[in-house]
């Protein structure tokens, strides 16, 4: 397979319009998302806070094309995910969307650098920014040869952020990146996330319960009972 370089694309960010996600039928129907509107511009870091069960995880799943909404539109780079076939959606998600999970979700047998190289191998494209430079950008270049078992929780999250940027995503969806981290490391992780969001012009949505780190975000929204409002 021929390896190519990630192509330049026009970034328009993320736009959710009148998105509803319901479960159940009739009187038992529950709205996880209730007519949600959300626009995130390239280079903008949005934090979403709110109680457990408010719909934050459902919002990330819909925005990432992992769950199909009951109604509404989910547009990334002028493409409505709702209109794509499953195969086209999988390809689009790979090329335009990045995910960072609270566990880091790294491959135990691979070094930090090889975590990033694996993405290049899977996609068949060289990263627009070399993996070595991405690790340097998140302060992990000195630990490039270490496997996850020899990294702290904060270090694993840094690698997870770098890995998510390998495919040059237009939209980055981040779920509780500071969970189980102490206060200092929590601030460090969100500072890194904010810097990379601005540096690479990524539209980033971060779900968090950690109010201490909100100062690093461009906007903060609160989700209550499936609805978004300014925090």
Question: Which residue stretches match the model-derived regions?
Answer:
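Short coil-to-helix segment of the ABC ATPase nucleotide-binding domain corresponding to the Q-loop/switch region
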Residues: 110-117
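Conserved ABC transporter NBD signature motif
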Residues: 72-80
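Helix-to-loop junction immediately C-terminal to a conserved catalytic motif
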Residues: 64
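Conserved signature/switch motifs of ABC ATPase nucleotide-binding domains
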Residues: 94, 146, 167, 200
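Catalytic Walker B motif of ABC-type/P-loop ATPase nucleotide-binding domains
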Residues: 172-175
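ABC ATPase NBD coupling module
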Residues: 30, 81-98
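Conserved ABC ATPase signature
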Residues: 147-151, 155-157
């Amino acid at each position: 397979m021929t390896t190519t370089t990630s192509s330049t694309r026009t970034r328009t960010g993320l736009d959710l319009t009148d998105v509803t996600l319901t479960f159940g039928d009739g009187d038992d129907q529950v709205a996880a998302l209730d007519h949600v509107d959300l626009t995130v511009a390239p280079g903008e870091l949005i934090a979403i806070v709110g109680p457990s069960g408010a719909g934050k995880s459902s919002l990330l799943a819909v925005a990432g094309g992992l769950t199909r909404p009951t109604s509404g539109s989910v547009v990334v780079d002028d493409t409505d995910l709702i209109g794509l076939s499953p195969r086209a959606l999988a390809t689009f998600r790979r090329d335009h969307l990045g995910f960072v999970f609270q566990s880091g979700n790294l491959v135990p047998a691979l070094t930090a650098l090889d975590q990033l190289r694996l993405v290049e191998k899977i996609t068949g494209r060289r990263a627009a920014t070399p993996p070595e430079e991405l690790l340097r950008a998140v302060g992990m270049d000195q630990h490039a040869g270490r496997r996850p078992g020899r990294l702290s929780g904060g270090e694993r999250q840094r690698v997870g952020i770098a890995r998510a940027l390998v495919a040059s995503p237009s939209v980055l969806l981040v779920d509780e990146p500071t969970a189980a981290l102490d206060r200092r490391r929590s601030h460090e992780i969100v500072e890194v996330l904010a810097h990379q969001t601005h540096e690479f012009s990524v539209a980033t949505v971060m779900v968090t319960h950690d109010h201490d780190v909100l100062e690093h975000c461009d906007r903060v929204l609160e989700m209550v009972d499936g609805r978004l409002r300014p925090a």
